[in-house]
Amino acid sequence: MGKDVPLLVASAPSLMAQAKEMMEGYTLKARKGLGQHFLISQGVLNKILAAADLKPTDTVIEVGPGLGVLTEELLKRAGQVIAVEVDDKLIDALTEKFKGYPNFRLIHSDILKTSPEEILGQNVPYKLVANLPYYITSAVLRQFLEAKLKPESMVVMVQKEVAKNIVAKTGDMGLLTLSIRFYGNPSLVSVVPGGAFYPPPEVDSAIVKIVIPQTTIMEGVSEVDFFKLARAGFGTRRKTLLNALAQGLGISKPVILSLLNGAGIDPARRAETLSMEEWKKLCLEYAGNPC
């Protein structure tokens, strides 16, 4: 008998090769004005999918599908994928690419002008997965976190420095950290080098996951009061809470001192040193003593 001859199996084209083929086929190019950087790393793609933790019954909203690299894998795992794309040049390409997927829906719209209710058409649980353009990161996060119909979780690609702010701990927290923690629990999944994209951005990125539970530590706290106090506290970061809140709220120092004492917070501390539990105490104290 002759020696066994190993079977030669053609490997799938790399994500970079797929991206170039699609861009050439539809005469596409990354649009700098839209902050487009297309994902070409299989390893990074796998990390996003693992973090998303999708089930066949899940509905997913994908913001900015780009060339559809992530979209294709989402479609294999979720019950429905609704992609929102603003770039009119990508619409035909995405429509053609996914015409064989009955669980795919494409919305040609600016995500910042489209609410979750408009996207979904009904009140259903959903997850958000997105490779966000840097220039709309904060706006998109705020839009979905503040929406009446919030996602169960968000897995987003953001600028590395923004990711560090999102997951910062007490002592380093800024207004962005605090805002996200009011609604959910953020965690860093992975740092992503520029080479994972085409064209590569000038800075590194990171994958962040935000889980939005039914109830949070801030349950019972007025959203309006919380953000009013938080913006005042961080408005002049180098100042003590006593001075920052007095200036930001336009309230006399004796009244602010009384609020801080009532919440058990040293007036000489700064906003970034407060834990979420302490912000809750301060908010409840403020609500119980209208100034």
Curated annotation (Swiss-Prot):
Gene3D superfamilies: Ribosomal RNA adenine dimethylase-like, domain 2, Vaccinia Virus protein VP39. It is found in: Cytoplasm. The gene is rsmA. InterPro entries: KsgA/Erm (IPR001737), rRNA_Ade_diMease-like_C (IPR023165), rRNA_Ade_Mease_Trfase_CS (IPR020596), rRNA_Ade_methylase_Trfase_N (IPR020598), rRNA_adenine_dimethylase (IPR011530), SAM-dependent_MTases_sf (IPR029063). This is Ribosomal RNA small subunit methyltransferase A. One of its GO terms (molecular function) is RNA binding. Specifically dimethylates two adjacent adenosines (A1518 and A1519) in the loop of a conserved hairpin near the 3'-end of 16S rRNA in the 30S particle. May play a critical role in biogenesis of 30S subunits. Belongs to the class I-like SAM-binding methyltransferase superfamily. rRNA adenine N(6)-methyltransferase family. RsmA subfamily. It comes from the Bacteria.
